[in-house]
């Protein structure tokens, strides 16, 4: 009886671990597909507009004011 109970507990624990890891791996796979999909790559190109490599005079004045 003790052996059957131990096997049942071990089976339940392993099943719980499998079901949780399946959910985590599913979310990771979904994120990878979102990033590497056509729409995901198009969305990443929108981030290029956020960075402007040139520093204007107003930016320099603001940095001097902070220092």
From Swiss-Prot:
Record field: transmembrane: none
Cellular compartment(s): Secreted; Target cell membrane
Annotated signal peptide: 1-23
List of residues that carry Leucine amide: 36
Keyword tags: Amidation, Antimicrobial, Cleavage on pair of basic residues, Membrane, Secreted, Signal, Target cell membrane, Target membrane
Pro-peptide region(s): 40-67
Domain of life the protein comes from: Eukaryota
Tissue specificity field: Expressed by the venom gland.
A Gene Ontology term for the protein's cellular component: other organism cell membrane
Function of the protein: Amphipathic peptide with antimicrobial activity. Does not show antiviral activity.
Family statement drawn from the similarity comment of this UniProt entry: Belongs to the non-disulfide-bridged peptide (NDBP) superfamily. Short antimicrobial peptide (group 4) family.
Official protein name in the record: Peptide Hp1165
């Amino acid at each position: 009886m003790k052996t059957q109970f131990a096997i049942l507990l071990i089976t339940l624990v392993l099943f719980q671990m499998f079901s949780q890891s399946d959910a985590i791996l599913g979310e990771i796979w979904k994120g990878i597909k979102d990033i590497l999909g056509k729409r995901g790559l198009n969305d990443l190109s929108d981030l290029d507009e956020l960075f402007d490599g040139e520093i204007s005079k107003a930016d320099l004045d603001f940095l001097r004011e902070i220092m």
